[in-house]
Amino acid sequence: MAPTVKTAAVKTNEGNGVRYRGVRKRPWGRYAAEIRDPFKKSRVWLGTFDTPEEAARAYDKRAIEFRGAKAKTNFPCYNINAHCLSLTQSLSQSSTVESSFPNLNLGSDSVSSRFPFPKIQVKAGMMVFDERSESDSSSVVMDVVRYEGRRVVLDLDLNFPPPPEN
């Protein structure tokens, strides 16, 4: 099943042709493109372009970066794997904000270099509680508690109905 794509090109009654999502015409004839960052709730300037189609494509690239396959774009994007994901690889030429999504690389080297958090060795019989505050000024609190109790094994399969009660 092909993904549904929402497009936003709209015919206007003013005779100016087509209007695109995230594109506005400047008084001197060029077209400006911008988009709202869904995470920071701020506008991201994508640049000015000679044609409305160029500006709309810049908007589409960034919309796919921010929202993925659920992005509302100006142009239909049928081949998600080849076309849309290649759009996310390159930023527009006049972008002033870095992408919110880092490249996905699950190798252990990149994880340890990008996330320099302390590593804690946990042995069997220990529980680690990690409590994080919502405040920007507080630090992480780690409690390590020694657990000496015995394990209880439940023979439980959630695919079957519960046993009858006595």
Swiss-Prot record:
GO MF entries: DNA-binding transcription factor activity; transcription cis-regulatory region binding
PROSITE patterns in UniProt: AP2_ERF (PS51032)
Domain of life from the UniProt record: Eukaryota
Motif (EAR-like (transcriptional repression)): 156-162
SUPFAM superfamilies registered for this protein in UniProt: DNA-binding domain
UniProt keyword list: DNA-binding, Ethylene signaling pathway, Nucleus, Repressor, Transcription, Transcription regulation
Entry's localization field: Nucleus
Gene Ontology BP term (one): cell division
GO CC terms of this entry: nucleus
InterPro entries: AP2/ERF_dom, AP2/ERF_dom_sf, DNA-bd_dom_sf
Keyword Ion transport (UniProt): no
Keyword Secreted listed: no
Regions recorded as binding DNA: 19-76
Disulfide bonds: none
Stored SMART domains: AP2 (SM00380)
Job of this protein: Involved in the regulation of gene expression by stress factors and by components of stress signal transduction pathways. Transcription factor that binds to the GCC-box pathogenesis-related promoter element. Acts as a transcriptional inhibitor and may regulate other AtERFs.
Record remark: domains: Contains a slightly degenerated ERF-associated amphiphilic repression (EAR) motif, which may be involved in the activity of transcriptional repression.
Family label: Belongs to the AP2/ERF transcription factor family. ERF subfamily.
Protein name as it appears in the record: Ethylene-responsive transcription factor 11
Species, as recorded: Arabidopsis thaliana (Mouse-ear cress)
